[in-house]
Structure formats: structure tokens, C-alpha cells
């Protein structure tokens, strides 16, 4: 069950993920990579404590060391204010509007998904693309976050089964092992 989005909104985000990062050839596409999970975790980051903002570390455990990326870090009060403002918007709160009103990710997603239409999932791909192109603010934000979700650290909810890294032939995080001199020389 989604953390922030309704099931319909989640399904729309998954469909849009495949429009933006299409499944082509060996690339699985945005839906299969868990972009909707990443977006939902980001939008609902403050539904858990600590919030899903900064993954722990120093190691993921994928190349040795203790797996601690999944242990999210507490935020300072300034970090929390900044991230809540970014995600939730200023909401008329003086402490969030010192530079004026801020439209948050949550509002951008809710409005963008609604503007795509309640029948978006039933439309063919050409109509879905036409509608998505008409929603510039939503499309622009989504593109950035779809790339983060598809190719970022899987602890944030995306890059399912490391499929994004595999699709772009990225070996992923290698600490604490690191790279050998030979591996570095061959990549140059």
C-alpha cells in the first residue's frame, strides 16, 4: 500500500514512469525499476521517524561492510524545515515562508496527476504523452525524480533489484572494497 499517494495516484505515477523511462530492449523501464515506490517514499518521507531523507552509512553491505544505508538519519531542525518545505510546501506557515510561499512536491504531484485526467490509465500511450507534455511543472519535477528513483541507491525505494544500475552498466557502490588499480585504468 502506498505511503502517501492513493492507489490510483500511485498507478498513474507508475504509468508515467514508463513514459519517461521507457522499457526498451534490455532496459526494464521506470515502472519495473520502482520509480513509483521512490516517489511515494519521497512524498511520504515524514510519515516515519526518522524521515526517509538521508540514508545512513558508511556502507550498503553490497560490497562488504555492515549494511547501514537502510538506517535513515535524524535531521537537524534546519534540515527538517528545509525538507518539509520542499516536500509539503510552505502551507502558509511563517517559518516556511521567509522567502515567500513555496509550492511543495506533494501539491505539484496531486495537481499534476489530477490534470492528467481520471481516465489517464485507460488512454493509449500517445494520448498519455500528449497529456503529460501539457503539464510542464509536473513533468519537469517528475523527470528529475524518475531518474533519481531509477538510478539512485535502492534504499530510497527505487532501482528495484539494482535493475537501473544493471541497465546502464553501473557497478554500483563498491565501498569498502573500492576499485583496484586495474579496474580504474580500464575505465579511463
Which role fits each region the language model picked out?
Residues 1-3:
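Short, Gly/Pro- and small/polar-rich lid/capping loops
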Residues 9-19, 26-188:
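Mature-region segments of soluble proteins
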